[in-house]
Amino acid sequence: MSFSNSKDKSVVAVYKLVKAPIYSHCFSQDKSILAVTCETDCLVYRVSNNTPPVLFATLKDHDKTITAVDISIHGRIVTCSQDRNAYVWEPLSDGTYKPTLVLLRINRAATSVTWAPNGYKFAVGSSARIIAVCYYEHENNWWVSKHIKKPIKSTINCLSWHANGVLLAAGGTDGFMRVFSGFIKGLDSKESVAGSPWGQKFPFGCLIREWYQGSYIHDVEWRSQMERIAYVAHDGTLNVVDYQSPVQSVNAPEGLPYRSLVWINDHEIVCGGYSCHPVLFSEASEGWKFAKNLDKSDNNKSSALTASGNTDELSGNNDESSTFGISALRKFKELDLKGKVSTDVQESAHENAIVELRPFAESNGQITQVSSCGLDGKIVIYTI
């Protein structure tokens, strides 16, 4: 484990926690607890200011890769896995967690999980073409699920609850972005959706809206106060839509798909993915557009090759479209000629793809810091 600070001012902290990909992470409400996935385990860390996270619990009941983790407002941890199971972990006074198996009733891997805002139910996406909405049944003392099936035709990659705890946005590999009703009788109240612009009646499992994107949907996030949804797709686009307007799309400046997004405020969104650094987009009068890169590696400053004596072929254009090709060519030529790569390049904090972004700090209704996890086993905190 290591704790370090980057030269880039947008990077607050870098935690190298494990030597395996981190597919999902989550902080507790007070940011004192950090849960990360690591193969078949969920590692729970205690976090304090300016010190590395300290591991204090390992949640071990899954026997296949854990795909997602989330923490409720009450401190309960939920995990889901490729073993087709989900567990709710109740924190105990001695610092341990008590697991409770959730009856998902699916025959394929569970892929995503998210708590509803009230912390009394959660939704699990799966490769079984099913969304399982799970809640606690006091009579039988266990967590049970109700299924949303139609018209889902493929794996569910991502889920997001509206602030009212009823509307559930879902995206997956069938190329559709959909909004369903996750209303649970006896748990949710009709007053919570009274006056909603999305409709008048919300029976469980009802399809409210759908939009066809034509490529995998990797992540989705509500902006509830504006009744808007943002999602990122494998075609390298960020898309924003509401209940009446057509989809507004903006392309990633580097052409690489994003895996996750976070609303910063009503008019700004930060995305992260295969470019290994966050990218900020903003809304202007003409629509959404690229605003700036955060913690982007500075490939343009790397030294030219001198061993080959042929620097002309690397000088070329320095525009954005040619940067990747030039830097890749330089890297492999240096490996071939010198056995190493020049180290005067400022690298980004993440060395591999960013898989998930989460809000970390907020001030006056605006997100000021976000956290990320990646395939390099790092947790990074950025200032926007």
UniProtKB/Swiss-Prot annotation:
The keyword Membrane does not apply. One of its GO terms (molecular function) is actin filament binding. Its main location: cytoplasm. It holds the Pfam family WD40. InterPro entries: ARPC1, WD40/YVTN_repeat-like_dom_sf, WD40_repeat_dom_sf, WD40_rpt. WD repeats lie at residues 61-99, 105-146, 151-190, 212-251, 349-383. The keyword Repeat applies. It is found in: Cytoplasm, Cytoskeleton, Actin patch. GO terms for cellular component: actin cortical patch; actin cytoskeleton; Arp2/3 protein complex. One of its GO terms (biological process) is Arp2/3 complex-mediated actin nucleation. Keywords: Actin-binding, Cytoplasm, Cytoskeleton, Repeat, WD repeat. Gene3D superfamilies: YVTN repeat-like/Quinoprotein amine dehydrogenase (2.130.10.10). SUPFAM superfamilies: WD40 repeat-like. Functions as a component of the Arp2/3 complex which is involved in regulation of actin polymerization and together with an activating nucleation-promoting factor (NPF) mediates the formation of branched actin networks. Component of the Arp2/3 complex composed of ARP2, ARP3, ARC40/p41-ARC, ARC35/p34-ARC, ARC18/p21-ARC, ARC19/p20-ARC and ARC16/p16-ARC. Belongs to the WD repeat ARPC1 family. This is Actin-related protein 2/3 complex subunit 1.
